[in-house]
């Protein structure tokens, strides 16, 4: 596996203007994060430790400031002739690298699963399927006996698409040097063909190059769409809430931080509790809207690569406030008799304990309960399901029945959770 990567960021980004008038393409934000940040962090996640970044000379200062701001260690090489293309940019790294290394374009976005396989390949990483790209615009590759034979956008017969990711060794610099003696410009495609480097297929994963403003929007939508929670969502979240929130997140991901969205949805939840005291039906509808928006902070955090333990903790704490406040407001509106109060208290404490039981598991065992104890995913009573139930019952005016049902479902779920945790971890 390679431990060094050369990131080519020496171009001028003409097709992205006016977005690249003041910043280099590598520092352009897509879904709230700079392309260069995404590239470095994701390569670090798959084992790359050393970075060499070739940048346009006029943006050298901005790139160095960016690296310092984010505590990234990298050697920066200025390219005073960006018009000589990206093959020349790679040549500038000659003498700075030993052994095998990866080469990646700064304007490409890859999913982690792609990178995990790509760093184990050789030569040009080729995608046979090209599921997420414009195939007419993409650079095509024809391989013969495992090596590049032809490469270009206009090939009629080809084996796959150039992903912009290479795994090379020092011999590539000799080929580049010979080529530059014969010509003034050198692209990576020309260099790859001239060196007849190997082809390695990695197909079916997301990757794309961000070449135009339209590409920025396309990449943003994909990053948000794939930023939903892996496990733990209930039936309503999977089939309703996330279908709504993932359509809203692309409009917010460049404007808000995750914690800002956490606070805003908390305020909406508390407002729904206030409304519920006067109008339970309207309050229930507002609470369901709040539930549909509650995933925005997590989606934005994952799309922006800003997930933090504090953010998850804050979201969990504020959700408990909303749950308790809303049911308390309903109880005050109901003005229950003393003999009904046990149902009210059981519903209140049960609703809080459902979430507390799984959160406390995470604190005790340092792992997600839903990922380890799969039976928990199918137990009725998760927060999204309770809120949807609250909306239905309040619209129908069945407030007393709501407290009874919540009391039974939530506390039964907690009892079953205790049993399942004991069964899985009782001896730990």
From Swiss-Prot:
This is Bifunctional IPC transferase and DIPP synthase. Pfam families: CDP-OH_P_transf, NTP_transferase. The gene is spsI. InterPro entries: CDP-OH_P_trans, CDP-OH_PTrfase_TM_dom, CDP_ALCOHOL_P_TRANSF_CS, IPC_transferase/DIPP_synth, NTP_transferase_dom, Nucleotide-diphossugar_trans. The chain crosses the membrane at residues 266-286, 336-356, 389-409. The lineage of its organism: Bacteria, Pseudomonadati, Aquificota, Aquificia, Aquificales. Mg(2+) binds at residue 116. GO terms for cellular component: membrane. It catalyses: 1D-myo-inositol 3-phosphate + CTP + H(+) = CDP-1L-myo-inositol + diphosphate; CDP-1L-myo-inositol + 1D-myo-inositol 3-phosphate = bis(1L-myo-inositol) 3,1'-phosphate 1-phosphate + CMP + H(+). Involved in biosynthesis of di-myo-inositol phosphate (DIP), a widespread organic solute in microorganisms adapted to hot environments. Catalyzes the condensation of CTP and L-myo-inositol-1-phosphate into CDP-L-myo-inositol, as well as the biosynthesis of di-myo-inositol-1,3'-phosphate-1'-phosphate (DIPP) from CDP-L-myo-inositol and L-myo-inositol-1-phosphate. Its cofactor is Mg(2+). GO terms for biological process: phospholipid biosynthetic process. It is found in: Membrane. Residues 228-425 are annotated as: CDP-alcohol phosphatidyltransferases. CTP binds at residues 8-10, 25, 80, 116.
């Amino acid at each position: 596996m390679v431990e060094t990567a050369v990131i080519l960021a020496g171009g001028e980004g003409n097709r992205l203007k006016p977005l690249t008038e003041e910043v280099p393409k590598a520092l352009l934000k897509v879904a709230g994060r700079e392309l260069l940040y995404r590239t470095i962090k994701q390569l670090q996640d798959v084992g790359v430790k050393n970075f060499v970044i070739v940048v346009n000379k006029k943006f050298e200062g901005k790139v160095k400031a960016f690296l310092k701001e984010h505590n990234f260690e990298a050697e920066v090489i200025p390219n005073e002739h960006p018009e000589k293309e990206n093959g020349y940019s790679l040549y500038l790294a000659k003498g700075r690298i030993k052994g095998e290394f990866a080469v990646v374009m700064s304007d490409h976005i890859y999913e982690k699963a792609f990178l995990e396989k790509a760093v184990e390949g050789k030569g040009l990483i080729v995608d046979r399927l090209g599921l997420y790209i414009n195939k007419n615009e993409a650079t095509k590759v024809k391989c013969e006996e495992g090596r590049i034979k032809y490469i270009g956008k206009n090939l009629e017969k080809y084996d796959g698409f150039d992903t912009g990711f290479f795994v090379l060794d020092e011999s590539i610099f000799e080929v580049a040097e010979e080529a530059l003696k014969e010509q003034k410009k050198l692209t990576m495609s020309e260099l790859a063909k001239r060196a007849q480097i190997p082809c390695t297929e990695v197909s079916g994963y997301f990757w794309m190059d961000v070449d135009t403003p339209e590409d920025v929007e396309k990449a943003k939508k994909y990053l948000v769409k794939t930023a939903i929670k892996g496990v733990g969502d209930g039936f309503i979240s999977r089939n309703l809430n996330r279908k709504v929130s993932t359509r809203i997140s692309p409009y917010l991901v460049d404007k808000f931080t995750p914690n800002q969205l956490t606070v805003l949805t908390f305020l909406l939840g508390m407002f729904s509790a206030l409304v519920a005291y006067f109008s339970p039906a309207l309050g229930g509808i507002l609470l369901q809207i709040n539930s549909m928006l509650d995933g925005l902070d997590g989606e934005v955090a994952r799309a922006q690569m800003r997930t933090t333990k504090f953010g998850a903790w804050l979201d969990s704490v504020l959700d408990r406030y909303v749950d308790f406040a809303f049911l308390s407001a309903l109880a005050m509106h109901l003005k229950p008799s003393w003999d009904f109060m046990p149902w009210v208290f059981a519903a209140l404490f049960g609703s809080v304990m459902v979430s507390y039981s799984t959160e406390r598991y995470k604190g005790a065992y340092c792992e997600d309960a839903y990922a380890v104890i799969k039976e928990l995913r199918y137990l009725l009573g998760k927060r999204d399901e309770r809120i949807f139930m609250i909306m239905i019952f309040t619209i129908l005016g069945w407030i007393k029945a709501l407290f009874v049902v919540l009391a039974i479902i939530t506390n039964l779920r907690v009892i079953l959770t205790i049993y399942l945790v004991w069964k899985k971890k009782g001896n730990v």
